[in-house]
């Protein structure tokens, strides 16, 4: 087989090199390697000085790079050699070459194969016929006839078939016009990502047929004109003009529309437009039409900078027919950090505001994709929060303003939290103290404001200081940590208290002693080796009694009774109550650890408080705690294998012999797209909980193909895969389903279909039901009917996995010729 390097090929200097001469073949290989790494040919020539010339400077050295430079500079690309070969090569040097039989032309990342080819050197023009194939950076074109200027990549291809590397999309056309290296126009074209088989009767599940498709590799965007989208051989959507991605890069344009039908808004059509402003800025504008309510406009703007980032959202609906008024909402999120000579500074803003008290009920599902009884409190409390932080060394400052918007329901009013206008906090935490001591000082000033019609108590300015000193004694086998705290609080009220005073003060010390031991032994259970620990712990705390019944409550509540709070000094969270404790908490935990990795396979724990005197300090309306023995906390967690998980917490009252609170959860996740979880939650009436509840929660995602023996993870060309997915929340107390999300997913090689039924509780007496459909054409677009089921599944189903996770772009050498 003949091989003819043309004038664009590497030029080998004829003079003798400075060092011992290299054989021509080795020299050519070295020059080619340098050229591929981006070294200009002019530099290569200079690197070969004459024998008589002294070297003026050291030869160029290669620089390390994290990746191979695929896009060469124009000057380098112009000097790339052209190589041709075939069964028979004829022609004139520097003019033209004719290759017959297995003809091949190579230049850079472009390779042309054909039965016959003619190459004109002066015009850099290749004409090929018969089984023509172009491979350019992994993108392949096949056809009958080609006329191409190789470097400029301009010309045409007749009767072409094509396949693109990044999306695995392919199709055919009567003609492909190459406009330049990055742009082309495909005429009478088809486009699909369905995997082609060798069967003569093969037809793709979906295909786009268009009069023209413009392909832009700079923007990675395809634009189809005068087209129609076919699914299963049936035209489903006429497309006068549409853009679609040629890679995973973001692009401006219309996003797939969303069509919905629910019991509140009626039929809903939303058409989002995505604006890719810059690599670090984008916006989404979504006009929406609702048959029962009118039109709405939603906007979202995001930005990201090295020192700050944020998000702005706004929604507006003029004359909502549901409430006969304008509806609006906006949100601002901003986070920033700055380095200054005086220390680090941070800024945070989180503001949410809506037009009226019914907004959470009328818009919560459309905006967030989720609503429910457990979510309502958060949706009804909208923050207006701004914080400014400063830190340097051992000191830090915080300045904060927080103003809530509380959305009230006349049938279920809630007490709004207090606004903090403003709050100023200083903390001092020395890093090194003599004698192994740890110490800190925290001082806070807050002005609390709220509507007295709801709170029933005066507003106030509160100042407090808390100083503490501890001395940890640490050893591998255990620890002892004595701690002393001093709390000082002062109030100034805007109205007199019941005793007629407008001020109040309180100063209290607290002493605590925390201690624990750690025993270890080798153990073996169920044929498996473990390192077993036994960790007894004792925690004693004492705070003297001080009458605090007249002090209002601004930011304080009873701590939840759990393994985290049982070993703390105060039974209350916040600064308005300090419990008069004289108690000892005893507990023990045992763990089974993997001796090689340290992973926890099992954990069992028990803890109980022993009270030596009554706790007289309570929340308003509360009763003193006089039980000498508290409820017993029992906890267990088992992760015997990564596939299985079990967790349980029980609050047991030894006096009544009954459990006041029980939580049991289990999970089985043997592989991708396979997970089942179940939970049981029971809560009796306690001093903290006024409404009992008992619920069962089940969630799952599982391929139905497993039922008939098809246990793969991905679909094949022989058929797709069915998945069942959902979550059920059932109230045993009310004997009804509270929340329901159930659906089916079907994954083919090139499309995904989803149907989801969602029924979520809006209030104690009402719910909203939605039926959602979606078909996703892989590598092209996604069409939804009934809002977005993906959002609902991700937010409601524990450990839900998208059927098509993002993957890295394949190398162009996966389709190398």
UniProtKB/Swiss-Prot annotation:
GO annotation (BP), single:
Gram-negative-bacterium-type cell outer membrane assembly
Q: Which InterPro entries match?
A: LipoPS_assembly_LptD, LptD, LptD_2, LptD_C
A Gene Ontology term for the protein's cellular component: transporter complex
Q: List the Pfam families.
A: LptD, LptD_2
Its signal peptide is 1-45
Q: From which domain of life does this come?
A: Bacteria
Its keywords, alphabetically, are: Cell outer membrane, Membrane, Signal
Q: Where in the cell is it found?
A: Cell outer membrane
> Could you tell me what this protein does?
Together with LptE, is involved in the assembly of lipopolysaccharide (LPS) at the surface of the outer membrane.
Q: What is the annotated quaternary arrangement, including any partners?
A: Component of the lipopolysaccharide transport and assembly complex. Interacts with LptE and LptA.
Query: Which protein family is named in the record?
Result: Belongs to the LptD family.
Put simply, this protein is called: LPS-assembly protein LptD
Tell me which species this is from. Acidovorax sp. (strain JS42)
């Amino acid at each position: 087989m003949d091989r003819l390097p043309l004038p664009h090929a590497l030029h080998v200097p004829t003079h003798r090199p400075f060092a011992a001469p290299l054989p021509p073949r080795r020299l050519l290989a070295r020059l080619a390697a340098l050229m591929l790494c981006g070294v200009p040919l002019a530099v290569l020539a200079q690197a070969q000085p004459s024998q008589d010339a002294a070297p003026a400077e050291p030869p160029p050295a290669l620089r390390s790079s994290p990746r191979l430079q695929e896009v060469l500079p124009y000057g380098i690309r112009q000097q790339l050699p052209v190589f041709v070969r075939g069964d028979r090569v004829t022609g004139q040097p520097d003019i033209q070459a004719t290759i017959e039989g297995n003809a091949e032309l190579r230049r850079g990342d472009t390779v042309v194969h054909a039965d016959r080819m003619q190459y004109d050197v002066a015009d850099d023009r290749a004409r090929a016929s018969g089984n023509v194939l172009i491979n350019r950076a992994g993108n392949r074109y096949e056809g009958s006839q080609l006329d191409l200027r190789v470097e400029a990549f301009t010309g045409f291809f007749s009767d072409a078939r094509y396949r693109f590397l990044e999306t695995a999309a392919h199709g055919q056309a009567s003609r492909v016009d190459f406009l330049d290296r990055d742009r082309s126009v495909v005429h009478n074209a088809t486009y699909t990502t369905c995997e082609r088989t060798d069967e003569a009767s093969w037809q793709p599940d979906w295909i786009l047929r268009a009069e023209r498709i413009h392909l832009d590799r700079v923007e990675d965007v395809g634009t189809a004109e005068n087209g129609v989208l076919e699914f299963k051989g049936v035209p489903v959507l006429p497309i006068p003009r549409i853009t679609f991605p040629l890679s995973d890069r973001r692009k401006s344009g219309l996003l797939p529309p969303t069509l919905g039908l629910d019991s509140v808004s009626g039929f809903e059509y939303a058409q989002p437009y995505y604006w890719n402003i810059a690599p670090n800025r984008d916006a989404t504008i979504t006009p929406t039409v609702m048959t029962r309510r009118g039109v709405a406009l939603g906007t979202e703007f995001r930005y990201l900078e090295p020192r700050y980032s944020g998000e702005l959202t706004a929604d507006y609906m003029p004359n909502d027919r549901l409430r006969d008024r304008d509806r609006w909402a906006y949100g601002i999120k901003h986070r920033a950090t700055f380095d200054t000579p005086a220390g680090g500074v941070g800024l945070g803003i989180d503001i949410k505001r809506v037009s009226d008290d019914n907004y959470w009920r009328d818009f919560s599902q459309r905006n967030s994709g989720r609503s429910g009884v457990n979510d309502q409190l958060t949706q009804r409390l909208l923050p207006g929060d701004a914080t400014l932080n400063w830190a340097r060394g051992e000191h830090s400052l915080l300045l904060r303003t927080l103003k809530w918007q509380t959305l009230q329901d006349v049938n279920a009013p809630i007490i709004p939290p207090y606004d903090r206008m403003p709050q100023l906090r200083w903390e001092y935490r020395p890093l090194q103290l003599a004698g192994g001591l740890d110490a800190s000082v925290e001082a806070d000033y807050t002005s609390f404001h709220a509507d007295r019609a709801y709170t029933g108590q005066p507003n106030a300015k509160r100042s407090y200081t808390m100083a503490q000193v501890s001395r940890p004694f640490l050893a591998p086998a255990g620890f002892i940590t004595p701690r002393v705290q001093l709390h000082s609080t002062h109030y100034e009220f805007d109205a007199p208290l019941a005793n007629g005073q407008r001020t109040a003060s309180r100063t209290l010390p607290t002493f605590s002693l925390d201690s624990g031991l750690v025993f270890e032994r080798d153990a073996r259970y169920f044929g498996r080796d473990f390192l077993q620990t036994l960790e007894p712990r004792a925690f004693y705390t004492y705070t003297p009694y001080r009458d605090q019944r007249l002090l209002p409550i601004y930011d304080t509540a009873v701590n939840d009774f759990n393994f985290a709070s049982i070993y703390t000094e105060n039974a209350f969270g916040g600064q308005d109550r300090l419990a008069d404790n004289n108690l000892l908490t005893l507990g023990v935990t045992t763990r089974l650890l993997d001796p090689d990795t340290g992973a926890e396979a099992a954990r069992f724990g028990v803890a109980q408080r022993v009270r030596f005197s009554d706790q007289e300090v309570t929340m308003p309306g509360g009763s003193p705690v006089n039980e000498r023995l508290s409820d017993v906390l029992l906890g267990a967690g088992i992760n015997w294998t990564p596939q299985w998980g079990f967790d349980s917490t029980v609050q047991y009252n030894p006096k009544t012999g009954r459990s006041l609170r029980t939580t049991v959860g289990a999970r089985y996740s043997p592989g991708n797209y396979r997970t089942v979880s179940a939970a049981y939650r029971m809560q009796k009436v306690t001093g903290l909980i006024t409404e009992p509840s008992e619920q069962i929660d089940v969630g799952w995602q599982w391929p139905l193909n497993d039922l008939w023996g098809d246990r793969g993870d991905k679909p094949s060309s022989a058929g797709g895969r069915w998945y069942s997915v959902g979550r059920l929340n059932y109230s045993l107390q009310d004997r009804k389903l509270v929340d329901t999300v159930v659906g089916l997913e079907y994954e083919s090689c090139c499309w995904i279909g989803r149907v989801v039924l969602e029924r979520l509780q809006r209030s104690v007496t009402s719910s909203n039901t939605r039926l959602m459909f979606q078909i996703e054409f892989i590598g092209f677009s996604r069409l939804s009917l009934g809002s977005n089921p993906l959002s609902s599944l991700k937010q409601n189903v524990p450990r839900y996995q998208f059927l098509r996770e993002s993957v890295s772009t394949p190398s162009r050498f996966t389709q190398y010729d």
